[in-house]
Amino acid sequence: MQTPKLIRPTLLSMAILSSMAWATGASAALVPPKGYDAPIEKMKTGDHNFSCEAIPKPYTDKLVFRSKYEGSDKARATLNAVSEEAFRDATKDITTLERGVSKVVMQYMRDGRPEQLDCALNMMTTWAKADALESREFNHTGKSMRKWALGSMSSAYLRLKFSESHPLANRQQDAKIIETWFSKLADQVVSDWSNLPLEKINNHSYWAAWSVMATAVATNRQDLFDWAVKEYKVAANQVDKDGFLPNEMKRRQRALSYHNYALPPLAMIASFAQANGVDLRPENNGALKRLGDRVLAGVKDPSIFAEHNGEKQDMTDLKKDPKFAWLEPYCSLYTCSPDVLEEKHEKQPFKTFRLGGDLTKVYDPTHEKGDKGDNDGS
């Protein structure tokens, strides 16, 4: 039977709409970069010496903490030993959780012991059920702790969620509890760090955007992904023609250190965006590459920064290998020079809990070095 002519366009339109809907649905699921799908290395059985450390008490109080730069001038470049100790003490349970989740997830992805998975999930569900870190009472240091903790946990969780070993297949209730909590925290982080004046947007905002990007992929929320990309673009447009970040240059003797500290979240966001078909490398004429090149040059010759802001640079932090974990995503986005690759290989593996653990395992697994550095990173 011949289809009436009037109906043909309708059927064609339906077919087109159907194919568009399928394509949209197929591309809608957010994913991390390729290495996050790595399987568990070896499912170990039998005797073991793993024991899950006590879960720190969920932090449900107001997020008001002293700054380690308390009493410093606007440069925020001079540490206050007394207030730093008070800060470390007040935030100990939060950082213990961050480090614990990262470490145990790394151990589980290596050994595959059920006890390790139980431990990691129990840490996160315990805090989730307590509505930890959700306080609307906070100061700058407090909201900073919230976004750091979220980024640490959600990026470690990605290793579990996307592994081709599917460790969460039989833990869907735990996954739901954790992801619902991450989602709530991300909404608050977006609120905490939105609509700041440009002079107030610095590495803290970049780290906030990273925590939201990791959570976007963990919870498959496009709105969070879009916010992180938007914040990245603001950051990229702060990079000047010479590769400097004016707001980080204000940090005087710590300017180079803070330029380096700005790179991990930005490189990770760009890498995650790339995995989802969004190429951020051209933003502001290749700002990320310009920033990375400037920092690498500055590490070799700190006088570049000293000449720019008149301060001899404090290189203490830059002697710690995990501070260069950004080289993993960076060298996946760009073709790094042989000397940069050599330096990267010397410093590997890069394990830093604020980026979810072992980035070498994700980005450059052929240069992984077992459990070396499991307790390192910041």
UniProtKB/Swiss-Prot annotation:
Optimum pH is 7.0. It is found in: Periplasm. One of its GO terms (cellular component) is periplasmic space. One of its GO terms (biological process) is alginic acid catabolic process. It catalyses: Eliminative cleavage of alginate to give oligosaccharides with 4-deoxy-alpha-L-erythro-hex-4-enuronosyl groups at their non-reducing ends and beta-D-mannuronate at their reducing end. Its EC number is 4.2.2.3. The monovalent cation sodium enhances activity but is not absolutely required. GO terms for molecular function: poly(beta-D-mannuronate) lyase activity. It holds the Pfam family Alginate_lyase. Keywords: Lyase, Periplasm, Signal. InterPro entries: Alginate_lyase, Alginate_lyase_dom, Chondroitin_lyas. Substrate binds at S67, K68, H140, T141, Y258. Belongs to the polysaccharide lyase 5 family. Catalyzes the depolymerization of alginate by cleaving the beta-1,4 glycosidic bond between two adjacent sugar residues via a beta-elimination mechanism. Degrades deacetylated polymannuronate (polyM) alginate from P.aeruginosa more efficiently than non-deacetylated polyM and alginate from M.pyrifera. AlgL from P.syringae also degrades its own alginate, which may indicate a role in cleaving preformed alginate and/or in determining the length of the alginate polymer. May serve to degrade mislocalized alginate that is trapped in the periplasmic space. This is Alginate lyase. It comes from Pseudomonas syringae pv. syringae. The gene is algL.
